[in-house]
Amino acid sequence: MLFQFRDSEMPVLERLDTVLRELVEETAIRTGCRAEIERTATGKPWQMDSAFQAAIENAAARHAPDAYVRMPSGASHDAQVVARKLRAAMLFVPSIGGISHHWTENTDDADLVLGCQVLADAAEMILRG
């Protein structure tokens, strides 16, 4: 079984890891069912560029007022790796039914078009300074 915790704050991630380990140990004591926890790749959360984020948020507010959310990405996306050396940010569009990182993931064409419009406007804002 694989668990993946995501948060922008390392103390939260560490606490989630501790709680999972405690839960596994308590379950083993209570039921006799043992499990081992192996921590795989862990990375420190990385903040995206605030000016890039602001440009995306401003463009989203123009194209989809009250229909966007500013959120951190806790995943180790390429942007998180790139952001350690270059300015970077991410723009997410909704997946149908909230299904993400699965072979059935899909996004409505209208949301893809809207995402492209937001991205184009954000890029223009960034280039104009």
Model segments located where?
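Active-site-adjacent substrate-binding region
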Residues: 34-38, 42-94
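Acidic-enriched catalytic cores of C-N bond-cleaving enzymes acting on peptides and small amides
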Residues: 12-34
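Extended hydrophobic-aromatic, low-complexity segments
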Residues: 12-16, 68-70, 100-102
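Midchain, well-structured core segments that form catalytic/ion-binding scaffolds
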Residues: 1-15, 41
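His/Asp/Glu-rich mid-to-C-terminal helical/loop segments that flank catalytic regions of hydrolases
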Residues: 17-22, 93-129
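Alpha-helix N-cap and loop-to-helix initiation/capping positions
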Residues: 12-15, 48-51, 107-111
